[in-house]
Amino acid sequence: MAEQEYDLIVVGSGAGACWAPIRAQEQGLKTLVVEKTELFGGTSALSGGGIWIPLNYDQKTAGIKDDLETAFGYMKRCVRGMATDDRVLAYVETASKMAEYLRQIGIPYRAMAKYADYYPHIEGSRPGGRTMDPVDFNAARLRVTALETMRPGPPGNQLFGRMSISAFEAHSMLSRELKSRFTILGIMLKYFLDYPWRNKTRRDRRMTGGQALVAGLLTAANKARVEMWCNSPLKELVQDASGRVTGVIVERNGQRQQINARRGVLLGAGGFERNQEMRDQYLNKPTRLVDGNPCGRQYGDAHRAGQAWAHTGADGLVLGRAHHGCSQGAGLSRHFRGTLAAGVHGGQRQGAALPQRVRPVSGIPAAMLAENAKGNGGVPAWIVFDASFRAQNPMGPLMPGSAVPDSKVRKSWLNNVYWKGRRWKIWRADRRGRAGLQVSARRMTEYARAGKDLDFDRGGNVFDRYYGDPRLKNPNLGPIEKGPFYAMRLWPGEIGTKGGLLTDREGRVLDTQGRIIEGLYCVGNNSASVMAPAYAGAGSTLGPAMTFAFRAVADMVGKPLPLENPHLLGKTV
C-alpha cells in the first residue's frame, strides 16, 4: 500500500473542513483535503451560507449593541446544560475572530440587522445583528474549470432555478416590499444580459449564500496551494501503539492508500442523514430517508471510523440530534418553504393545531414527533391554505400559483397536495382529522381578522414578524376563506444531523472515557454540536464548524487559544 505524508489531513470539504487547511497552510503546515464525492463543498454549498457570530465586526454598522457576557448567557440558556460551559464560552469568544479572518482572506460578511435570534423569549437574545450573510461573490474569481468541481446550489434557493438571490433580497420579496419588484427585474436583466459568462456555464456569475461562501473558500484554498482530492472516500483511521491517530486510509483510483499525518487528522465530513440504518438507530421515530436532505452522500463514514473509540454519548443522546426541517414527503423538497407564513394553518391528524409558536421552525417537526410518540397522530400533519395565499406565495415545492397554476402541478405530487373548490371537501384527504382541522382552521381565520393569535401568539415577537406580511393587521396571520382550498402533507425531516463525535473546546475528539484522542479533531455535523438540541440563530451550523476549525488549527500549531473570560464558567444564568 502506497504511503504519503502531510502535516494535516482533512476529511470532507464543507465550510469547516475547507476552512481549516487554508489557515493551516498560512501557519506553515502541509495539508491535504480528501473528499468522498466528485464535487467539493458538501452541504455547505447547498446552504444559505449564514453564520451566527456574536460581537461580529459589522454589528456597529448595523446599529446593534452586544456584549460577551450577554451572548454567553443567551447561548448557555439555549443549550440547557447539554454542552459544557467551556465549549460555549470558547465559541462566543472565538467566533468573531474567525469571521474577521474570513474577511481578511477575501470572504466578507455583513450583519443582518433585522434577523432576530431564534429564541426571542430567552434572556440575552438580540433583535438582529448576530446572524451574518456572505457578500456576493463573482464566480469569475474561481474560474470556470474550478467552478465545475464545486457542488451547485439547489434550484429552490434560486430565482426560477437559475438566478442567485441573497437573504436580504429574499426577505424583501417575502415581505412584499415595493422595491422587491425592481430587485427581481434587476436580477433577471443582469443574468440574461451577461452573454459572455452564460456562454461558458449555466451557473450564475453572481454567487450568494452558501455558494458565495464555498466559492470564496475554494478560491482561498487554491491561492494557499492546498492539495485537494475528490473521489477519495475515507476507509479507516490509523493509530499508533499509544492510541494517537497518525493518518488515514482512503480509496483513490480503485486502490487503498495510507496517508500519514504529522500533526493531526480533522474530520469534517458532515452528518449521516443518508444512512437509514443509523437513522433508525439514533433518530426519533418515524424517520424516513426520503425526508432527509436528498443532496450529497452523508452516510456517516467518518462517524463510523471514529465510533469504535470516540465518545458519542450514552444511548444516542449526542448522535440523536438533528437540524430539523419540514418535508413535503417523497423527496420533493429539501426545505419546506412558507410553514410560518401568514395565511397558513398547520394541523395534526387528530385535528389539533400544530404548535406554530415553536421557534425556530425546526421546533415544529420536533413537536410533531413528540405528539406522534404520545399517540396523538402528529405524523404526518397537514398545512392548509387558500387561493389568495396560493396565488402569491411558495409553499413547500410549489411555486406561487401566479407562476405555476394548478394545471401545471406535477402529477407525482398529487398524493401529497389536495385542493377543492369548497373548504369542507379537502378534509377528505384525512378523514380522522376532518372535524378538528375544520374547527382549528376556522379559529385561525377569526384570529387573523382580530389580529391576535390567542393560541400560539403568532406575530407576537420580532422573529415571527421578520418574514411576515406588513399589509395585514397581524403580519403572521392571514384568513383562510377564498376557494379553492389547499391541503398539503407535512412530514418531519431534517436538513442534516448534528450528532457525532464529542469534542473539547479545541475540537479534539474525546474517547469513551472522556480523554483526549491525540491527533484527532472533528468539526461541523461530524461532531456533537456545541448548540446541543438548540439553534441559537440562523447560521448555528456553519458558524461553529468554522470557529472550532479555527481553534483546532491553533492547537495543532502549538498556539492554543486560551479562554479570555474564565470567570464566566459555571456562572448561573
Swiss-Prot record:
Where is FAD annotated to bind? 7-36
**Cellular localisation:** Cell inner membrane
Classification via InterPro entries: FAD-dep_OxRdtase_2_FAD-bd, FAD-oxidoreductase_2, FAD/NAD-bd_sf, Succ_DH/fumarate_Rdtase_cat_sf
Instruction: Please report the record's description of how this protein sits within the membrane.
Output: Peripheral membrane protein
Where would you say this protein principally sits, based on its record? membrane
Q: Which GO terms describe its biological process?
A: steroid catabolic process; steroid metabolic process
List the catalytic activities from the record.
Answer: a 3-oxosteroid + A = a 3-oxo-Delta(1)-steroid + AH2
Q: What is its EC number?
A: 1.3.99.4
Does Lipid metabolism count among this protein's keywords? yes
UniProt keywords, alphabetically: Cell inner membrane, Cell membrane, FAD, Flavoprotein, Lipid metabolism, Membrane, Oxidoreductase, Steroid metabolism
- What pathway or pathways are given for this protein in its record? Lipid metabolism; steroid degradation
* Protein family according to the UniProt entry: Belongs to the FAD-dependent oxidoreductase 2 family. 3-oxosteroid dehydrogenase subfamily.
Record function comment? Dehydrogenates steroids by introducing a double bond in steroid ring A.
What is the recorded name of this protein? 3-oxosteroid 1-dehydrogenase
